[in-house]
């Protein structure tokens, strides 16, 4: 995940906010105080990793419907992390129970987290305090 500075001395500069994530990030939200929530849609896959340097293959794959990747990417594993303002992981939420998976968004509203997914038929909510 890269960070682009919008204000201050570093305005216009870009740096790495966090890397080497164990899963693929899909969406990022800020709780307006001290945490960035990152939805991790799928665990990393060695096959996908090997395709990263093959631009021609990535272009072909980008044109396929999401459903073409369901069997490879959408395990019944739910994963989200919270980062502090410096990019350090301060919370890690994981489940393999299958109740929530393929998380594409995490939003905090007061003491609740709301999880969204393109493949699940409903929104999920979790108390955090």
Regions found by a protein language model. Give the residues of each.
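Sequence-structural signature of mature extracellular/luminal beta-sheet repeat domains
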Residues: 1-129
């Amino acid at each position: 995940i890269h960070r682009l500075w919008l204000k201050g001395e570093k305005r216009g500069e870009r740096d790495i906010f966090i890397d080497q994530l164990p899963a693929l990030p899909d969406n990022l939200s800020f709780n307006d105080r001290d945490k960035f929530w990152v939805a991790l849609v799928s665990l990393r896959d060695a096959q996908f990793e090997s395709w990263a340097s093959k631009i021609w293959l990535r272009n072909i794959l980008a044109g396929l419907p999401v459903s073409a990747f369901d069997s490879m990417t959408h395990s019944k594993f739910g994963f989200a992390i919270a980062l502090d303002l410096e990019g350090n992981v301060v919370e890690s939420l994981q489940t393999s129970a299958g109740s929530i998976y393929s998380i594409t968004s995490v939003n905090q509203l007061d003491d609740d987290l709301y999880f969204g997914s393109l493949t699940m038929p409903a929104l999920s909510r979790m108390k955090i305090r």
